[in-house]
Amino acid sequence: MKRRLASKKTVVCVGPGGVGKTTTAAALGVIAARSGLRTLVCTIDPAPRLADALGVANLGAKPSPIAAATAAALGIASPDRLHAMRVDPSAAFAQLVNEQVADPELRRHIFGNPLYRSVTTNLTGSQEYAATLALYEIRRDGAYDLIVLDTPPTANALEFLETPERLATAIASPAVQWFARPDPREKRFSLKRLGVGGAMVIRRAGRLMGSQFLDDLGAFLLDIREVLGGFLARAREIEAVLKQPDVGFVLVLTPAAAAVSEALYFARRLRETGSPLCCFIANRTLPEPGNHTAASLRASLLSLPSLCDLPKEELDLATTCLARMAEFLAKIARAQKQELERLSREAPGIEITTVPLLPHDVSNIDSLRAIADRLGSG
């Protein structure tokens, strides 16, 4: 993993929610910082997972170094080698608007429009696009040797990859370009531009949502055309960045059938788009099942001081319960092994790194150090 990180400027951790993606991103940041790279780990997840993992009290939209005590506990020579931040989607969109619109009055109109706020916070893909905007700006700034991006929690790992392309396609569509076409005679948006059918739809929406909706819509459609060209250009630039050889995608998963199938599909999509897949990281893997007999399990129980004086009936019951639990875990371990073999077989040449299931939740520095040690040894 150290070798792979050394050859990259950006590592993007992708995968569905709940697979340990944020912790993996933090661990990769620790590995890079240990090797002397000035590293930034950034997330767009509003939950405090990254802050908790790195021991950062207030994770904000500006990069900040980890605490000196945290750096020492993680085996990092200097706290300045590892910074962390949380991407603010509103700030990411606002920065792009500020770049594209010179007129402060027009910027004020755009930022104050409720539809702008709704589109940039609630529209499907807005979080993913904000993450790509932040990544683009940080790379352009050049302050870090490595950027590790923890992508938004999503049910579909493809959201991050496809959002810039979808946005560019939408902006370039004839319908949006028609709305964006300048007309110097227009001081406000006119429903006449929509034709009879379109105007009827908008009027009905206005009756349902109120006249203010029509005013907000008209202002938004007129104002936003000033920035559509910039949004389109930036989306195209981000598409190009994600295909650079110094960018590596790390697909984080758990060794379950559905997760592996999604990972294989994502790997195929990456190949189709020319984006580089660095490796798979499979979290929460169980060890190879041992050959546990009833006698060996009973002996293990008797070796515990608190259980050695149990009555025979209770010891028999405990042995039976332990045997069933061992059988259950062995079944899961065998299923995981089969899924990882399928992943290796259907995605040849892509390295798979496994991280064992820890006996406790990953919520402190000791757990993060253990995962970084595991990943760094591969």
Residue locations for each model-derived region?
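Nucleotide-state-sensitive switch-loop elements of NTP-binding domains
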Residues: 1-12, 19, 24, 28-232, ...
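Glycine- and acidic
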Residues: 12-14, 116-121, 247-252, 325
